[in-house]
Swiss-Prot record:
Membership in a protein family: Belongs to the actin-binding proteins ADF family.
GO MF annotation, one: actin filament binding
Organism this protein belongs to: Oryza sativa subsp. japonica (Rice)
Identification of the protein by name: Actin-depolymerizing factor 9
InterPro entries according to UniProt: ADF-H (IPR002108), ADF-H/Gelsolin-like_dom_sf (IPR029006), ADF/Cofilin (IPR017904)
Name of the gene this protein is made from: ADF9
Length: 139
């Protein structure tokens, strides 16, 4: 179904791979990209479970927008192992204005397609999504 604000559709693979991350923990992260030609949101990269947060952060381009989800494992103050799924809206200052507008107008609709997101991060610079910030948001 197309997004009324931006006219974008969400490729079914986005939802299937997210369900796999959420239920079977088949991936550590998923990076999504808007395909301008097809006018839809598609899976760009799947991060394997052995990949860490630094690997994930390195996949986000310095001058292009992306959406992503990351499955963060952490230990609580009570020494309990937990996991939270983060949604990232990556919109660097150096990205094209049209791209930033397209990602911004599609974000809420796309995020609603991914049922089970627990935290959201909007970042324009890597410092806004450091591992310390993510861990603090998880608790």
């Amino acid at each position: 179904m197309a997004n009324s604000a931006s006219g974008l559709a969400v490729n079914d693979e986005c939802k299937f791979k997210f369900q796999e991350l959420k239920t079977r923990r088949g991936f550590r992260f998923i990076v999504f990209k808007i395909d301008d030609k097809a006018m839809e949101i598609k899976v760009e990269r799947l991060g394997q479970t052995a990949e860490g947060y630094e690997d994930f952060a390195a996949t986000l381009p310095a001058d292009e927008c992306r959406y992503a989800v990351y499955d963060l494992d952490f230990v609580t103050d009570e020494n309990c192992q937990k996991s939270k799924i983060f949604f990232f809206s990556w919109s660097p200052d150096t990205a094209r204005t049209r791209s930033k507008m397209l990602y911004a107008s599609s974000k809420d609709r796309f995020r609603r397609e991914l049922d089970g997101i627990q935290c959201e991060i909007q970042a324009t610079d890597p410092s806004e999504m450091s591992l310390d910030i993510i861990r603090a948001r998880a608790h």
